């Protein structure tokens, strides 16, 4: 009995996922350690720089929990987007096998990055809790929906980056640079309400602001962020994914033959 297209893609993605693990980490455990050290180092540096100021301005909120729920979502978005750029070149030989498509490589990479950072998030939140910092998951459904939309959004941006990077090779070095400003305008280091309201309309165009603030609302009792919307995040995600899929559809054959 012939397999359906979905079953073929499922097997392909599973194989690519295992290949990504071997490529990313190899036989060494240092790769797994680095996945934990990178966000941990960011957390410690920002705690050292901003901890005292934030404790004065937000005395009732755990600053480590506040930071973690900004850093990890940004790392997920940044990592999936950037690792999608070279996905075709990294798997070029595999495309001789008909079932393997470029989009499968992005799905496999997105799954790996998601699993890594979700595990890191849980681990660091446990460490923060054991040090005496308080948090409570008050809206688990909101947290799951927000992060699910974040992953889909990242895949949509990844598709766009992959197509643009393959069509215009010189853009492969430019595209990661475009993500850098998002680190500073996505409310990672500061709450939205600390910005004057007249500037909110500009910041709220950024979907990552909604991801970060909704994540904080879900795990920090009493933290309420005006202006953010799960509906806006869902709409922005769907539009981005549609654009990514449309570009991929029109350029798939050209990318494989170029």
UniProtKB/Swiss-Prot annotation:
GO molecular function, one term: ABC-type transporter activity
Residue ranges annotated for the ABC transmembrane type-2 domain, each copy included: 30-251
Cytoplasmic side: 1-30, 82-108, 166-174, 248-258
Gene Ontology cellular component terms for the protein in this record: ATP-binding cassette (ABC) transporter complex
Periplasmic side: 55-61, 133-143, 196-226
Chain segments annotated as transmembrane: 31-54, 62-81, 109-132, 144-165, 175-195, 227-247
Membrane topology: Multi-pass membrane protein
Family, similarity comment: Belongs to the ABC-2 integral membrane protein family.
Protein role: KpsM and KpsT constitute a system for the transport of polysialic acid across the cytoplasmic membrane.
Protein name: Polysialic acid transport protein KpsM
């Amino acid at each position: 009995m012939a397999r359906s297209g979905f079953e073929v893609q499922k097997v392909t993605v599973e194989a690519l996922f295992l290949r990504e693990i071997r490529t990313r980490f190899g036989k060494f455990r240092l790769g797994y350690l680095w996945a934990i050290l990178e966000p941990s180092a960011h957390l410690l540096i920002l705690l050292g720089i901003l901890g005292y100021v934030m404790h004065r301005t937000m005395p009732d909120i755990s600053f480590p929990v506040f930071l973690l729920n900004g850093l990890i979502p940004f790392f997920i978005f940044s990592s999936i987007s950037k690792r999608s750029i070279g996905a075709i070149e990294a798997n070029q030989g595999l495309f001789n096998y008909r079932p393997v498509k470029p989009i499968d490589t992005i799905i496999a990479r997105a799954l790996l990055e998601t699993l890594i950072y979700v595990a890191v998030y849980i681990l660091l939140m446990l460490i923060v809790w054991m040090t005496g910092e308080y948090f409570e998951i008050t809206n688990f459904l909101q947290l799951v929906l927000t992060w699910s939309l974040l992953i889909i959004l990242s895949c949509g941006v990844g598709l766009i980056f992959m197509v643009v990077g393959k069509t215009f090779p010189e853009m492969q070095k430019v595209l990661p640079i475009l993500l850098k400003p998002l680190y500073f305008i996505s409310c990672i280091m500061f709450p939205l309400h600390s910005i004057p309201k007249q500037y909110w309309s500009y910041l709220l165009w950024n979907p990552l602001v909604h991801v970060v603030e909704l994540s904080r609302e879900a795990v920090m009792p009493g933290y309420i962020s005006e202006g953010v919307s799960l509906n806006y995040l869902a709409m922005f995600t769907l539009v981005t994914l549609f654009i990514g899929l449309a570009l991929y559809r029109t350029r798939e054959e050209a990318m494989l033959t170029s």
